């Protein structure tokens, strides 16, 4: 068994992209080559980061099993699948764990396991693409039903050919989006005090924006008189969304009386939503900062489900 600590193998962003680092990283060079390949294909940095951490967990498990990447078989992957189902780790109740006892979570949720298996499958498909003599050990299942060759024209012409699914996928229950009811949404919104936070919540609830989309907005992306916003979503795809008149008024008030003109160094940014106080005042609001804002207001309002995405889900439910 490899004697390895968490510091021997970890994930970091060196500026060139997400990669495994540490003394043990030399044993898993294939992973870093795969992550670089994803970056070259213009996968979003968040996707590359997620793959990096999923493969980090797999590589740490392999080290504990005294197994190299080149020795992985289908039987190895089945044992890892069992490990994901029975592993215990420190955590808190949430959608990513099955149960929790004495401060420790037991077993990853199906979505987490499937995401990890997708990363592993992609890794070995990448290896097989470079070296056809090294086939992927991931067992393939039946292909998903999609349009036949004769059907893939006209409106269906964009559909890809069916791809086989992995036999290692865990059955994943399909759940409806969990939004907030009217009382919960009102209680959460009433707890916000700053114009910035009210505008952010309004864009999520009434325009259906994701957290990342809100944070990526520039001042010029919002047309307040016409009530439109140009939003950059997943895959850098742009779309124009309507902005409620009340939310537009909140944004205008925020711009006039609350938004900082520059940071402590005098640097100016086009980002719409900025840090309001502290040493980072005037700098773009980060995902961590936004989560901290919502965490504070969940506690203040007593709406335990008041996460940023819950507001977007509330928008989806209301417009369904």
Predicted region positions:
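Short, basic (Lys/Arg/His-rich) helix/loop patches that form interaction surfaces
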Residues: 241, 291-320
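N-terminal DNA-binding module of tyrosine recombinases/phage integrases
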Residues: 1-41, 176
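Conserved tyrosine-mediated DNA breakage-rejoining catalytic core shared by Y-recombinases
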Residues: 207, 212, 216-250, 260, ...
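Active-site/catalytic core of tyrosine-dependent DNA strand-transfer enzymes
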Residues: 245-303
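Basic, Lys/Arg- and aromatic-enriched nucleic-acid-binding interface segment
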Residues: 172-211, 237
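Flexible interdomain linker/hinge and immediately adjacent N-terminus
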Residues: 78, 133-187, 232, 276-281
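Basic, Lys/Arg-rich DNA-contacting stretches centered on the C-terminal catalytic core
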Residues: 101-105, 169-171, 191, 225-247, ...
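N-terminal core-binding DNA-recognition domain of tyrosine recombinases/integrases
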Residues: 32-46, 56-155, 187
């Amino acid at each position: 068994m490899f004697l390895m600590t968490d510091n021997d193998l970890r994930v970091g962003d060196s500026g060139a992209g997400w990669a495994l680092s540490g003394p043990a990283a030399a044993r898993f060079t294939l992973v870093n080559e795969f992550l670089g390949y994803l970056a070259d294909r213009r996968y979003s940095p968040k996707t590359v980061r997620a793959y990096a951490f999923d493969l980090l967990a797999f590589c740490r498990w392999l080290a504990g099993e005294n197994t190299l990447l080149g020795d992985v078989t289908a039987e190895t992957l089945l044992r890892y699948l069992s490990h994901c189902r029975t592993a215990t780790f420190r955590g808190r109740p949430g959608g990513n764990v099955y149960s929790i006892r004495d401060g420790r979570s037991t077993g990853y949720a199906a979505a987490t396991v499937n995401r990890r298996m997708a990363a592993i499958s992609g890794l070995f498909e990448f290896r097989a693409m470079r070296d056809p003599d090294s086939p992927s050990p991931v067992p393939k299942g039946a292909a998903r039903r999609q349009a036949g060759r004769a059907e893939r024209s006209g409106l269906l012409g964009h559909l890809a050919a069916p791809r086989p699914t992995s036999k290692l996928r865990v059955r994943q229950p399909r759940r409806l989006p969990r939004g907030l009811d009217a009382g919960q949404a009102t209680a959460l919104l009433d707890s916000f005090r700053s114009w910035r936070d009210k505008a952010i919540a309004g864009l999520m609830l009434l325009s259906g924006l994701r957290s990342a989309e809100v944070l990526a907005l520039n001042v010029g992306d919002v047309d307040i008189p016409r009530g439109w916003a140009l939003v950059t979503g997943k895959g850098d795809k742009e779309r124009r969304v309507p902005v409620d008149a009340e939310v537009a008024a909140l944004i205008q008030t925020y711009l006039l009386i609350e938004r900082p003109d520059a940071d402590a160094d005098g640097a100016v940014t086009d980002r719409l939503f900025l840090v309001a106080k502290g040493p980072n005042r005037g700098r773009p609001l980060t995902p961590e900062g936004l989560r901290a804002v919502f965490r504070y207001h969940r506690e203040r309002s007593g709406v335990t489900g008041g996460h940023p995405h819950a507001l977007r889900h509330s928008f989806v439910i209301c417009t369904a």
